[in-house]
Amino acid sequence: MNGTDLPRLQPKIRRVNLDTGRENVVVISRHSAALRPEIFRGFSRVELRRNAKIMLATLIITDDDSLVGPDDLGLSEPAFRRFAEPVGSAVTIAPAASPASLDAVRAKIMGQTFSAVDISAIIDDLTHYRYSDMEIAAFLISSASFMTNGELIALVDSMARAGTQLKWRNPIIVDKHCIGGIPGNRTSMIVVPIVAAHGLTIPKTSSRAITSPAGTADTMEMLARVDVGVEEMKDIVAACRGCLVWGGHVNLSPADDILISVERPLGLDTREQMVASILSKKLAAGSTHLLIDLPVGPTAKLVNEMEAMRLRKLFEFVGDHYGISVEVVVTDGRQPIGNGIGPVLEAQDVMAVLANDPEAPADLREKSLRLAAHLLEYDPKLRGGSGYARARELLDSGAALKQMQKIIDAQGPPTCCTDLGNLTFDVTASRDGFVSGINCLQLNRLARIAGAPIDKGAGIRLFKKIGDRVQQGEPLYRIHAFERSGRDLAAAGTTAYTIDSEESNLEATP
């Protein structure tokens, strides 16, 4: 039996101030005449219909009539925005039939493979919010144990086609992406102005933080607007040859954003899903030449070179299929890159490097130059092997800073608070010796406890890196926060630093 076999009851729409993430949720009173116990149960899927408009949602039943009255149907904020009908409108509600594409998910769980048609239908249902979070989880888990190359190609294709697809006039569109996991590491904000100042086109779309203290979009937002639309983005790129904007507002690969929202709580991060996530967005963005940064370290996403090699081959395979020139570089992921962790602190690092400040973090400068060099080598007019020298020339001369300011002016001024957290606590060394290890995962966690990225000025300022000599009581890093509770909780956490005696051999650190 499905929703078309039952009478459709018509409560009136009420807007409920509930943030339910990406999931459509509707709330009904237990005392509502529309609530038929033999038909509706809590957390069941229902179909809402008004005229020709249809939306699927998860049903919540409440005993609190102050939230929704007996004649009302409350729509959570995401559901209200998507349904886009005025408060007080009569709406029919009925049990929802399961999406037909779930049959393919069940078959995959039992060991079969997806066809390209299966994956296309699944992604279509995902992007039209026909799947609940539980059904999305089922799809992710069904794909986690194994995925064929054919399934991966079909997944990338379907995800790229589901959103905006950008087209550019230039024959060479360069881009870069890091798989993440390393605190700081805000190289894109230095690479983009260097490459754009040279003359190549680099329309960079970036993500916001999900489990980290800052994403590139969060950090760029300290300097300029990042929530620009497609047409405005094209205008900025036409004027500046580059941009640094939030990909979510441009709507590249919307299925990926939905999948990530369920992946992260489950701790799922398979190689295939990572490749599909990244390359679907780059394919939709119109990239022709792509540089992938794979940090390797004991607390990075990739812990050894073998893992990096397997992932590299997967990126190259999919890139070749779609005609994207993919270059993969393996980088040092043993410790943070730069001194700041958190949006404001990371933005300060970026601008210090671009301004050639003598106090700027040398590791962030050097890594950015090396990555920019790889991208500049894609210019057929540039002599082979001269990419690094050209990148350094553009940075040292101030051309990159000038280009960054041009991009900032084109995107517009920031719209959020850019103050640094004024409550601080210094974490100090417990003994004399040398820093032999830094736990990236732990530092990310401490920065989030301090308030980042919600509080833009919260985070951590590092004073010591691997190989540095320290004395007992000397500050290793400083916690910044706006709330006393965040500062104190972060200060009470594990130090994240390993300190060995002078006699220890630092080469033992992977």
UniProtKB/Swiss-Prot annotation:
Q: Which taxonomic lineage does the organism of this UniProt entry have?
A: Bacteria, Pseudomonadati, Pseudomonadota, Alphaproteobacteria, Hyphomicrobiales
| Stored Gene3D superfamilies | 1.20.970.50, Nucleoside phosphorylase/phosphoribosyltransferase catalytic domain, Pyrimidine nucleoside phosphorylase-like, C-terminal domain
User: What's the Enzyme Commission number for this chain?
Assistant: 2.4.2.4
Name any one Pfam family assigned in the record.
Glycos_transf_3
Q: PANTHER family of this UniProt entry?
A: THYMIDINE PHOSPHORYLASE
The answer to keyword Metal-binding applying to this record is no
The protein's matches in PROSITE patterns, at most eight in alphabetical order, are given as: THYMID_PHOSPHORYLASE
Task: State any GO CC term.
Answer: cytosol
Q: What organism does the record attribute this protein to? A: Nitrobacter hamburgensis (strain DSM 10229 / NCIMB 13809 / X14)
GO MF terms listed in the record are: 1,4-alpha-oligoglucan phosphorylase activity; thymidine phosphorylase activity
Would you tell me the protein name for this molecule? Putative thymidine phosphorylase
Per the record, the domain of life is Bacteria
Catalytic activity field: thymidine + phosphate = 2-deoxy-alpha-D-ribose 1-phosphate + thymine
Keyword set for this entry?
Answer: Glycosyltransferase, Transferase
Q: Which residues form the signal peptide?
A: none
Q: Does the keyword Glycosyltransferase apply?
A: yes
Q: What class of enzyme is it?
A: transferase
What's a single GO BP term from this record? pyrimidine nucleoside metabolic process
The similarity comment for this entry is: Belongs to the thymidine/pyrimidine-nucleoside phosphorylase family. Type 2 subfamily.
